[in-house]
């Protein structure tokens, strides 16, 4: 029997230390019943159902799981992904948007599957409440950096829960 691998690290930007069992999948939860994030959760749920390969969709059964997302910490890629998703939002919704809304993208800008790196048919964008979009972004950052310790290039999935 092989012992599980434990990786310990210190994140350079925040100087926080922690450990992670590498065999334990990193799964970020978003909730449809959380009024602060329900718009993002709904968008992600629909995107995972319609995008090729159910990208990022978590299921305990590997046969029903989508392809993993991989994190990028490269600011140039993150910014390029955000710019590309913004362009795609304006293209798909030329009538514009109301004040207080943000362009939400899935897969996330902080992944190697973001809008600047994949065809438009592998992306989903939608205008949602800015507060909702920012809340999920903040939670995702905490998940990647502190809770799950997902390093640059490592895999993670997203589970939409009730």
Regions flagged by a language model, labelled:
Residues 1-100, 109-162:
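Nuclease and nuclease-like effector domains acting on nucleic acids or nucleotide cofactors
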Residues 103:
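Short hydrophobic beta-strand that contains or immediately precedes a catalytic carboxylate
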């Amino acid at each position: 029997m092989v012992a599980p691998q434990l990786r310990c690290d210190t994140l350079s930007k925040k100087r926080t230390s922690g450990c992670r069992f590498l065999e334990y999948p990193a799964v970020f939860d978003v909730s449809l019943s959380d009024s602060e994030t329900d718009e993002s959760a709904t968008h992600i749920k629909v995107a995972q159902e319609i995008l090729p390969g159910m990208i990022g969709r978590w299921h305990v059964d590997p046969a029903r799981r989508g392809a993993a997302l991989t994190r990028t910490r490269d600011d140039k890629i993150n910014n390029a992904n955000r710019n590309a998703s913004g362009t795609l939002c304006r293209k798909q919704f030329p009538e514009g948007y109301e004040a207080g809304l943000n362009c939400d993208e899935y897969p996330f800008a902080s992944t190697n599957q973001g809008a600047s790196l994949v065809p438009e048919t592998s992306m989903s964008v939608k205008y949602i409440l800015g507060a909702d979009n920012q809340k999920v972004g903040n939670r995702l950052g905490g998940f990647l950096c502190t809770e799950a310790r997902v390093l640059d290039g490592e895999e993670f999935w997203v589970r939409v829960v009730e």
